[in-house]
Amino acid sequence: GELVEQMHEDLYDGLAEEIAEGTQIFLDRGWEATKVLDAALVEGMVVVGDDFRDGILFVPEVLLAANAMKAGMALLEPILSASGVEPIAIMVIGTVKGDIHDIGQKLVGMMMEGAGVQVFNLGVNTDKDEYIDALEEHNATILGMSALLTTTMPYMKVVVDELKARGIRDKYIIMVGGAPLNDEFAEHVGADAYCMDAG
């Protein structure tokens, strides 16, 4: 219990070395990699995500925390893939065309990975064909689109409409996120879910 709490604090403070050490200690104690991931890393990142959403933490701190989580993940990933833990889903994520902010989708990507989803991140300024090609190539079931500018938000609808035009909209769960968005907008563009700033 104590070390888990400590890990949450270290994650919150973005201390990558400490997170790597803590992760190793858990593994040495015989913890399953999935348990370390869930209890120490994902739980800790949820707190970071909540405080980011509530304006207590800002982008630089969140990036440090994400970086610290990566240090722990680096130790866990080889074990997880060797033990043949199948991803629960495959997701393609990217910031829409015209938008070059990637913090939100990076966070969502990390959270989803923490939850056992395999994530293919297309980066920023992604156009509709790139999204669709990636969905088909990776055999994904979830599409995540992020936009931080009100001017680029409508492009999400362009992507959804293109999926509809090709008759494949229903194959995917579509999640949209970003600062100016809300549930009403998600519904308007035809998405299934809206997640506020990766929270």
List each language-model region with its residue ranges.
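Long amphipathic alpha-helical segments
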Residues: 1-83
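Amphipathic, non-transmembrane alpha-helical secondary structure
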Residues: 5, 17-20, 24, 70, ...
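Conserved, mostly hydrophobic/aromatic
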Residues: 19, 55, 101, 112, ...
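Short glycine-enriched loops at secondary-structure junctions
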Residues: 42, 96-99, 125, 180
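Alpha-helix N-cap/loop-to-helix initiation residues
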Residues: 58, 100-101, 152
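Glycine-rich active-site/cofactor-binding loop and its immediate structural neighborhood
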Residues: 86-122
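Cofactor-cradling patches in redox/metallo enzymes
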Residues: 108-115, 120-191
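Short acidic-hydrophobic, aromatic-tinged amphipathic segments that line or gate anion-handling sites
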Residues: 193-198
